[in-house]
Amino acid sequence: MRQTKTGILLANLGTPDAPTPEAVKRYLKQFLSDRRVVDTSRLLWWPLLRGVILPLRSPRVAKLYASVWMEGGSPLMVYSRQQQQALAQRLPDMPVALGMSYGSPSLESAVDELLAEHVDHIVVLPLYPQYSCSTVGAVWDELARILARKRSIPGISFIRDYADNHDYINALANSVRASFAKHGEPDLLLLSYHGIPQRYADEGDDYPQRCRTTTRELASALGMAPEKVMMTYQSRFGREPWLMPYTDETLKMLGEKGVGHIQVMCPGFAADCLETLEEIAEQNREVFLGAGGKKYEYIPALNAAPEHIEMMASLVAAYR
């Protein structure tokens, strides 16, 4: 019997190809057109998106991307490629492809890349530690659309999330310990997760429960008292209520209350990107210090750290 050949598909959100208004507009149009992301009536949403949001937001967001752009591209792309290459070295018998839900390389190009390697089984690892319909669900939807056009489809193993995975929690804990050793233990460790509309959670998305699971497990691994660890949500968009408490408002409140030293980690981001490097490391630092805080550090994402790659390898190797 022929041995099954397994490939790995690493999936993430995506990024503009360049820090320009035109590239950002293309990216945002694709991203904000996905019903998993914005499920507003198309009759209402299309005119607002095309006539107001894209023209106004694209130039402003392009400037933000330019402030964090790296020699090899956007931070998300640079770190995602590093993850892909490191995982391929760690598992040399399993081809590894990278695909993005929006922008390039697309998920379809990643599937085609693996099929060209004659794999008959694909392990799909969305790099979102905590499941949400707007992230992991979007990967599932696009993968189904891609495979619906194939005459022959490979076996698929789909990793829903890894919010309480032991290796993931340990990697986070070691990163926090290293930051404490470098900067001193703060008054508070703030864990900031990307937000989603509260309505999505009310309708069954268990994302907030998965975030709470990671927070609980990480605090336990660190041996920190509950009052020394706080969980918030960032990056809200639009007018409807999102998961609370909001990161920026919380940091302002903490600064005003006299909390002097805070360190912030974003456990839901497998790779640093605009939302971590600009929003958290820069914008929210200014919010906290401007409200009276004294010391603020951002703890980087795991990116391509060896422990992170080992965690990925252990996750996917179970599905060989």
From Swiss-Prot:
Pfam families given in the database record: Ferrochelatase (PF00762)
Residue sites binding Fe cation per the record: H194, E275
Locations listed in the record: Cytoplasm
One MF term in the entry's GO annotations: ferrochelatase activity
GO CC terms in record: cytoplasm
InterPro entries: Ferrochelatase, Ferrochelatase_AS, Ferrochelatase_C, Ferrochelatase_N
Keyword Lyase: yes
PROSITE patterns: FERROCHELATASE (PS00534)
Catalytic activity: heme b + 2 H(+) = protoporphyrin IX + Fe(2+)
Location (main, coarse): cytoplasm
Keyword GTP-binding among record annotations: no
Entry's EC annotation: 4.98.1.1
Keyword entries, A-Z: Cytoplasm, Heme biosynthesis, Iron, Lyase, Metal-binding, Porphyrin biosynthesis
Domain of life: Bacteria
Enzyme class: lyase
GO BP terms, alphabetized: heme biosynthetic process
UniProt pathway annotation: Porphyrin-containing compound metabolism; protoheme biosynthesis; protoheme from protoporphyrin-IX: step 1/1
Assembly mode: Monomer.
Similarity comment: family membership: Belongs to the ferrochelatase family.
PANTHER family reported in the protein's UniProt record: FERROCHELATASE, FERROCHELATASE, MITOCHONDRIAL
Main function: Catalyzes the ferrous insertion into protoporphyrin IX.
UniProt protein name: Ferrochelatase
Source organism of the structure: Escherichia fergusonii (strain ATCC 35469 / DSM 13698 / CCUG 18766 / IAM 14443 / JCM 21226 / LMG 7866 / NBRC 102419 / NCTC 12128 / CDC 0568-73)
Top-level taxonomy: Bacteria, Pseudomonadati, Pseudomonadota, Gammaproteobacteria, Enterobacterales
Gene designation: hemH
